[in-house]
Curated annotation (Swiss-Prot):
Protein name per its UniProtKB record: RNA-binding protein 44
PANTHER family in UniProt: HOMOLOGOUS TO DROSOPHILA SQD (SQUID) PROTEIN, RNA-BINDING PROTEIN 44
Location of Phosphoserine modifications: 388, 391, 546, 726
Keyword Metal-binding annotated: no
Key words, A-Z: Cytoplasm, Phosphoprotein, RNA-binding
UniProt-listed InterPro entries: Nucleotide-bd_a/b_plait_sf, RBD_domain_sf, RRM_dom, TTC3/DZIP3/RBM44-like_helical
Amino acid sequence: MQATAVVETASGKGYHSNGGNLQKDKPSNPKKENLLLSSNGCDEVKLTFPDDDWNSSTLEQRANNKEISNIDKMDLLEPFFSVSQDTNTESTQFQSSELEDSTDYAFLNKTYSIPYSESKLKKESLTPLSSELDPEVQKKEEVFFNILEHQDKTVGLERIYNISDANYRESAEDTQKHDTDEDSQQEYHSAEEQEYISNHLSFDQTKALDISNPEVVELGNSGYEVKCASNVEDNRVNSGSGSIISFDSLDVYGQEESLHVSKFQNSVMLREYHDLKHEKYKEQETNSMYHTVFDGSVLRSNSPGNQESQSKSGSLSPQKVLKMKIYTENMKSQINEGKDFCGNKIVENKILLHLENPSTLPQDKALETLLQPCKDCQTSWTSVFDDSIISACGYYESLQNTADSALDFSAMLPKIAVRDNQAIEDNTSLKVAHSSTTKKTCFHNIGEMCTKSLTDAASCTVTINQTVDVSTDFRACFTTSRATSARPSVVSTSSNTEITMMNKKRPDEWQNEKQKSVACSTDWSYSEDCIDTQMAITKGSGKSLSVDSLKPNGNFLNKDFLELRKACGITDLKKHPEREFQLFKDTEKDLPSMCCQKIMQRAIKAELHLLNVHYQMCRRHCCDIYKLVMENREGLNMNLSSNSAKKELGSALLSLLGDLKVRYVTLKEKIHKGIPLEELPPLSLESKLLSTFSTFASRLMKKETHVFSEADAEQDNQRAHDVDVSSNLKKTLSQMSLSSDNSHATQNISPKKDDFKNGDINADFSQLKLGDKDCRHYQETSEDWSDAKESLTGVDVSGTQGNQVEQDTWNLDLTGEMKNVEPSQRDKGYLIHVGGLCPSVSEADLRSHFQKYQVSEISIYDSTNYRYASLAFTKNSDAKIAVKEMNGIEINGKSVNVWPVKILGEYTSPLSSKNGNRISSNNLEKSTNKQIHSEFSISRLPRTRPRQLGSEQDSEVFPSDQGVKKNCKQIESAKLLPDTPVQFIPPNTLNLRSFTKIIKRLAELHPEVSRDHIINALQEVRIRHKGFLNGLSITTIVEMTSSLLKNSASS
C-alpha cells in the first residue's frame, strides 16, 4: 500500500512525499485533501492515514462528498497571542455516546482563542484508530461539519483528558510511508525506515499555516468523549475508525453564541514561523513547516462497539495561560469518506494546522528542552516528528521565560530528532525527505531562522513514556469493551499484531506500572518522576543536558545544546521549581545554624550558672574559715590583742574575696565571648586565709602550747581521776605521781626547791619510754629536740597557776628534789629492756627464755625498724641476774640486748649510754647525778605526749600495791604515740621525723647559727609557700632554708 499526502497551495499545485522526496503533484481534486489530525498522550496533533486500504473508490467517494464551498485564504498577517494566567474560561465537554465511527476534523471559520492554564501535563492513555467507516457515521459527520460552516460562529472543541496514575506511557515506533501513486495507497514500512520531522512556528511572520509532511500522525489517547456544542444544537458524533479533533478552550470573538470552554490547566503555545501569503504559495514555500501547538487538541478514533468515555479536565502544563487568537476567514472542511478510508480529510484552505506538543521524557531518560530567543523576543516551539509516526511522552512541562513582556510566558525548545538523509535548508524553511534510515538531528536556530542539521543523527535519542507501534493492528487490542484492561503500551494501525518497539526493547520503567481499565477514572496524582523530570529540565542555563538514548549507538548533541542553552536566558521565572528547591536548601542551611545558636545560648547560661555556684561556694568557704579562726581565738582565751588578730585575719579575708571576685568577673566575660568553661582555668581559691591562719595559729601555739596539750588530753577522754589542776601539764604530772592508795593528791610544785612530793619515783619507769625511742629510729629526734631551750619552756614541770620559774631554775629544783626521793620507793619496781628482737620472736618465746627469772609481765613493741620487749620482775635480784645472763643471747637466730631500766643502787640510764652527746644531758650533768638526768628526761616526756599518760595513769605500778604490768602498758602507750615538736607545725606540713632531719642538716650546714634562728628561717620558708611544705622534698626545704639563713647572715 502506498499513501500520498497532498498539500494544496495557492497556485493549485500539490506536493506529495514519495520515497522520501518531495514531488510535485497534480491533485485529482484540487479542492480536496485528506488530512487526519490527532494528538498523542503529550498533546501532539499528528497527521495519519490509519486505514490499510485505499483504492480508487476512495477518490470517487471523495468527489461525491460535500465540498467546502467558501474556503477563502486564511489571513494570518497579524497573529495575536494574548497571554493570561488568571483567565478562567469555561469549557464544554463534547461527549460521544458511541465512538464507533471516525470523527472528522474541522477547521473553524472565525477567530478563536485557546487559553492555557498553569497546570501540568498528565499522561494520556492511548486511543486506537478504527479502519471502518459506516454510512451512518458519514451522515452524522456531515451534520457536524454543517454546523461548523457558519461563518459568524466558532465552535470550540475541548479536549480534556485525565491520565491514569502512571499506567500508560507512550513509546513511538518509526514507520515510514511512501506515496506510490495518485490513488493514495498506504503502506506501512518497518520501524527502521521511520523519520522524525521537526517543525517550528513563528509569531509575526506567519499568515498561513502549511504542513511539510502531513502523511502520518500518531494517535492520541483512548477513551475520550467529545461533545460538540454550538448555538444550534449539540451533536453526538460517532466515529468508527475515524477521529475527533477537539481544540482546548476555543473562544469565539465577535459572536453572540460563543462556546465556553472549560478551564483546564495545561498550555501549549501556538507558533507560526513564516509569514506566507496565500497568493505567494509556490513550490518552495510548500516545504515551510508551521507548527500550531494546541495543548488541548486531540484527535481520537475508537473501534466499533467500544464504550464511550467522557473526557474530563486535565492538567497539561504547569505554566502560564496562553490565549491564541487565530483570525481566519471562511473555512470549510470537506469530508471525503470511503469504505476503507478512515477519516482522512482534505482541507482546501491551503493551510494545514499541525498540532504538536513538546514531549517531556521520563525521569531516568529525561529530554531537556532548550530556549532560544527570537529576533522579536518571541519564543517558539520545536517538536519531535517522524515521517511515518510522531511520538511524544505522556506528560510534559513548559517553563516560563519572560522573553516578551507582552507574552509573559516562557517556552523551552525540546531536542529534535529527525530521521532523514536530507536536511534541506531553503531560505528559512526546512525540507525533510523520507526514504532513508540515516537519522539527523535538526535544531531550529530562531535567530537565523534556519535549521542546523547534524550528522550521525542515528544516535539522537527521544525518550517517551508512551509508544505507538504501527506494525500492530489496533483493532486487535480494542475490539472488546473499553472496560477491559488496556495495558498494552502500544497501539498499531497495521495488520501486524506483534508488539515491536522502536528500540526493540521495553523500557524498564514500564515493568513496574499498574494496569488500569480505560473506562475507569483516569485522574491521577502528579507523579514524583514528573517532578524529578521537571527538576532535570528546569536546570539553569550553562548546564549540560542529560539525555538517555533509546538507540544502541546514540550521540549527545552536547555542543549544540550548550550553544543553544547559552543563547537562551531563563530569567524572571515566577514559579521556578529549582528556585523553590534552592530556597528550601537555604532554609535547611539556616535551620541548623539557628539550632546551634539556641544550643550555644543554653550552654552559656548553664556555664554561667555553674560558675556562679562555684563562686558562691568559694566565698562561703572563706567566710567559714574566718569564723572558725575567730571562734577558736576567743575560745582559747588568747592573751594577745584581739584587735590585731581581727585586723590581720579580716584583711586576709577581704583580700581573698576581692581576688576571687576579680577572677569570677574575668571568667564570666570569657564565657560570654564563647570560650567554653572547660577551657578556662578553674576558679580556685587562693589559700591566703589558710596561710594566715596557719601562721597566726603557729605563733599562738608557740606561746601557749599547754592550751593545745589540754585539748589533746580532752580528745583522748582519759580523765579518769578527779585531780583538780589548772593546766594540762599539772594534770600530766599528777597522773604520773599516783600513790599506792590510788589517792590523787594535788601536786604542789613550788618554784622553790623543797616541795617535790610523792609519786615522782614513778619517773624512773617513764624513762624507759624515752629509752625505747632511742632504741628505735627516734634516737636523732631525742637528741635534736633535747637541746632546744625553748621547748622546755612549754613543758615546765612547775605548771601551777602563776608559775614563772625559768627553765634552768626548774632543772636545778628538779635535781634537788630527785635527790630527796626516798630509797624505799625506788625498790618497788624492776624492769628490764630486751632489744634487737627479730620479727619472729613472740611473747611465748621470751617467756620460755626468761621463765627461770620469775618474769611477771612481758610486753612486746614493734616499730618500722626496731622491735623490743619490756619485762617486769618482782625482785631486783631477779632483774639483775636476768640482765647479766641474757644479755647477748640469741633468740630465734638473732642476739638481743638486755639492760635494766631501773635497778636500785646500780641504775644506769640507757639513754645516757647511747646518747652521750645530747646537749640536754650537759645541763643535767651540772648536778653530777645520772639519776637526775634520767628524771629530767622523764620530765620532758609528759610534755611530748601528755594525752596518752592520762589513759595509762592507773598503769603506774608501785611495789606496794600494783604490779609491773601497768608500767609496761604505760611504756607501750607512750612508745606508740607520734612525736610532736615543741615548735608548732601544722600536722599537714611536716611530720616530726622529716622535721628532725631538716633541723639536723641545717645545724650541720650552719653550725654558727642557733637552733632558734634555724626554726625561724624554716617557719619563714613555710609562710612563703602559703603555710604548707607538702610535696617538697627534704633536700629542697633544706636548700631554701639554708639560702634564707645565708641571706639573713649577710644582711
